[in-house]
């Protein structure tokens, strides 16, 4: 299968390439690399020679492919996808961008949760597969065991989202902000006799100063947070909050009888792991040990963390999870509102299960089925 790769140099694309090398995906395909800026230079070698870089906007070149995997972003998809389909191309389009997620012709792909839907689509002519919103995918990886049994009446998700979700430049800016804050009070920190209130005042002054680096976030994130992600919708939700309900229900195949999902999406100073505090209204009172068993056995990556302080502090954090495929779930307990209310907290890497991993796994599924 000739597979075109677009956006492979960006942050998500780089993680995708790393995972495809680790899983030897390149052994199974003929890779064709595309670029929007460096056409004609040698393509990267991920275990086999791929010739030269091709023009990512050349419809005739793209038409020669059996599949395209793109991490190039929404504007690329908006320009190229309709033109390619209108030109008669009938290959598989596998996309990280949000542009096509809610299109009827597209399946939001997360195979540990909706493999049956993916296989049905492949066997019935679906050719467009799109990775889901990062928080949605990570939430479903964590709680798939409850959703597949139809046990969730509604859910509220309060998110703690990493800088990586906003892009590579935002990650750099977060680190720069941390450095500027440290530099502003480094001499005071080195002096044990200095007043922490004086240090705190200086930190606040630094964060509020006009020279503080905020070109990307617009406001300080280090030492602070931003309780808004993406644009505003008419009902007062942010678009990120809207995605939780519509995308999760599409992945679960529940558009006709959706589970209400809503909450507040917040950007915090983590690098690349999103965390979520979840309030789950169950349809019935289920013993906690049974809930834990359902969650833990749903897929190979979810991990139930006992609701104890020390192991939670060690295992249920971005620092522990970053760079791994593990999706730990903890703080599992019944709530004061009633025994049919469940509290949970989960963490996952935004660039792996939140972005790159579903794309490469979709390619492997297509290869296996075809």
Swiss-Prot record:
<keyword id="KW-0521">NADP</keyword>
<keyword id="KW-0560">Oxidoreductase</keyword>
<dbReference type="GO" id="GO:0050661">
    <property type="term" value="F:NADP binding"/>
</dbReference>
<dbReference type="GO" id="GO:0009088">
    <property type="term" value="P:threonine biosynthetic process"/>
</dbReference>
<dbReference type="InterPro" id="IPR012280">
    <property type="entry name" value="Semialdhyde_DH_dimer_dom"/>
</dbReference>
<feature type="active site" description="Proton acceptor">
    <location>
        <position position="274"/>
    </location>
</feature>
<comment type="similarity">
    <text>Belongs to the aspartate-semialdehyde dehydrogenase family.</text>
</comment>
<dbReference type="GO" id="GO:0051287">
    <property type="term" value="F:NAD binding"/>
</dbReference>
<feature type="binding site">
    <location>
        <position position="72"/>
    </location>
    <ligand>
        <name>NADP(+)</name>
    </ligand>
</feature>
<dbReference type="GO" id="GO:0009097">
    <property type="term" value="P:isoleucine biosynthetic process"/>
</dbReference>
<feature type="binding site">
    <location>
        <position position="243"/>
    </location>
    <ligand>
        <name>phosphate</name>
    </ligand>
</feature>
<dbReference type="InterPro" id="IPR036291">
    <property type="entry name" value="NAD(P)-bd_dom_sf"/>
</dbReference>
<comment type="subunit">
    <text>Homodimer.</text>
</comment>
<feature type="modified residue" description="S-cysteinyl cysteine; in inhibited form">
    <location>
        <position position="134"/>
    </location>
</feature>
<dbReference type="InterPro" id="IPR000319">
    <property type="entry name" value="Asp-semialdehyde_DH_CS"/>
</dbReference>
<dbReference type="Pfam" id="PF01118">
    <property type="entry name" value="Semialdhyde_dh"/>
</dbReference>
<dbReference type="InterPro" id="IPR011534">
    <property type="entry name" value="Asp_ADH_gamma-type"/>
</dbReference>
<feature type="binding site">
    <location>
        <position position="161"/>
    </location>
    <ligand>
        <name>substrate</name>
    </ligand>
</feature>
<feature type="binding site">
    <location>
        <position position="240"/>
    </location>
    <ligand>
        <name>substrate</name>
    </ligand>
</feature>
<feature type="binding site">
    <location>
        <position position="192"/>
    </location>
    <ligand>
        <name>NADP(+)</name>
    </ligand>
</feature>
<keyword id="KW-0457">Lysine biosynthesis</keyword>
<keyword id="KW-0486">Methionine biosynthesis</keyword>
<feature type="binding site">
    <location>
        <position position="350"/>
    </location>
    <ligand>
        <name>NADP(+)</name>
    </ligand>
</feature>
<feature type="binding site">
    <location>
        <begin position="164"/>
        <end position="165"/>
    </location>
    <ligand>
        <name>NADP(+)</name>
    </ligand>
</feature>
<protein>
    <recommendedName>
        <fullName>Aspartate-semialdehyde dehydrogenase 1</fullName>
        <ecNumber>1.2.1.11</ecNumber>
    </recommendedName>
</protein>
<dbReference type="GO" id="GO:0019877">
    <property type="term" value="P:diaminopimelate biosynthetic process"/>
</dbReference>
<comment type="pathway">
    <text>Amino-acid biosynthesis; L-lysine biosynthesis via DAP pathway; (S)-tetrahydrodipicolinate from L-aspartate: step 2/4.</text>
</comment>
<dbReference type="InterPro" id="IPR000534">
    <property type="entry name" value="Semialdehyde_DH_NAD-bd"/>
</dbReference>
<dbReference type="GO" id="GO:0071266">
    <property type="term" value="P:'de novo' L-methionine biosynthetic process"/>
</dbReference>
<dbReference type="InterPro" id="IPR012080">
    <property type="entry name" value="Asp_semialdehyde_DH"/>
</dbReference>
<dbReference type="GO" id="GO:0009089">
    <property type="term" value="P:lysine biosynthetic process via diaminopimelate"/>
</dbReference>
<feature type="active site" description="Acyl-thioester intermediate">
    <location>
        <position position="134"/>
    </location>
</feature>
<dbReference type="GO" id="GO:0046983">
    <property type="term" value="F:protein dimerization activity"/>
</dbReference>
<feature type="binding site">
    <location>
        <position position="101"/>
    </location>
    <ligand>
        <name>phosphate</name>
    </ligand>
</feature>
<feature type="binding site">
    <location>
        <begin position="9"/>
        <end position="12"/>
    </location>
    <ligand>
        <name>NADP(+)</name>
    </ligand>
</feature>
<feature type="binding site">
    <location>
        <position position="267"/>
    </location>
    <ligand>
        <name>substrate</name>
    </ligand>
</feature>
<dbReference type="Pfam" id="PF02774">
    <property type="entry name" value="Semialdhyde_dhC"/>
</dbReference>
<keyword id="KW-0791">Threonine biosynthesis</keyword>
<keyword id="KW-0028">Amino-acid biosynthesis</keyword>
<feature type="binding site">
    <location>
        <begin position="36"/>
        <end position="37"/>
    </location>
    <ligand>
        <name>NADP(+)</name>
    </ligand>
</feature>
<comment type="pathway">
    <text>Amino-acid biosynthesis; L-methionine biosynthesis via de novo pathway; L-homoserine from L-aspartate: step 2/3.</text>
</comment>
<comment type="function">
    <text>Catalyzes the NADPH-dependent formation of L-aspartate-semialdehyde (L-ASA) by the reductive dephosphorylation of L-aspartyl-4-phosphate.</text>
</comment>
């Amino acid at each position: 299968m000739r597979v075109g790769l677009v956006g492979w140099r960006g942050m998500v694309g780089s993680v995708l390439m790393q995972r495809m090398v680790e899983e030897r995906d390149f052994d199974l395909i003929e890779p064709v690399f595309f670029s929007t800026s460096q056409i004609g230079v040698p393509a990267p070698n991920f275990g086999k020679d791929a010739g030269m870089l091709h023009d990512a906007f050349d419809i005739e070149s793209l038409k020669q492919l059996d599949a395209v995997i793109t991490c190039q972003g929404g504007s690329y998809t908006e320009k190229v996808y309709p033109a390619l389909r209108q030109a008669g191309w009938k290959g598989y389009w596998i996309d990280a961008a949000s542009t096509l997620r809610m299109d009827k012709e597209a399946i939001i792909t997360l195979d540990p949760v909706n493999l049956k839907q993916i296989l049905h689509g492949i066997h019935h002519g679906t050719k467009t597969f799109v990775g889901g919103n990062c928080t949605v995918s990570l939430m479903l990886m964590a709680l798939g065991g409850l959703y597949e049994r139809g046990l969730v009446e509604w859910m509220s998700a309060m998110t703690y989202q990493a800088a990586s979700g906003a892009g590579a430049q935002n990650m750099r800016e977060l680190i720069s902000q941390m450095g500027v804050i440290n530099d502003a009070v480094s001499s005071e920190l080195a002096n044990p006799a200095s007043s922490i209130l004086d240090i705190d005042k200086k930190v606040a002054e630094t964060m509020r100063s006009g020279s503080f680096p905020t070109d990307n976030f617009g406001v300080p994130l280090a030492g602070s947070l931003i309780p808004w992600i993406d644009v505003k919708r008419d009902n007062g939700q942010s678009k990120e909050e809207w995605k939780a309900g519509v995308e999760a229900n599409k992945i679960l195949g529940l558009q006709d009888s959706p589970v209400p999902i809503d909450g507040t999406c917040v950007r915090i100073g983590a690098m690349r792991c999103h965390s979520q505090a979840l309030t789950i209204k169950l349809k019935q009172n289920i013993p906690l040990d049974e809930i834990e068993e359902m969650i833990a056995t749903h897929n190979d990556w979810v991990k139930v963390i006992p609701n104890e302080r020390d192991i939670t502090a060690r295992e249920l954090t971005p620092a522990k999870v970053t760079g791994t495929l593990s999706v730990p779930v903890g703080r599992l307990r019944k709530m004061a509102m009633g025994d049919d209310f469940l509290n949970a907290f989960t963490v996952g890497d935004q660039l792996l299960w939140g972005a790159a991993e579903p794309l490469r796994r979709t390619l492997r599924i297509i290869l296996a089925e075809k």
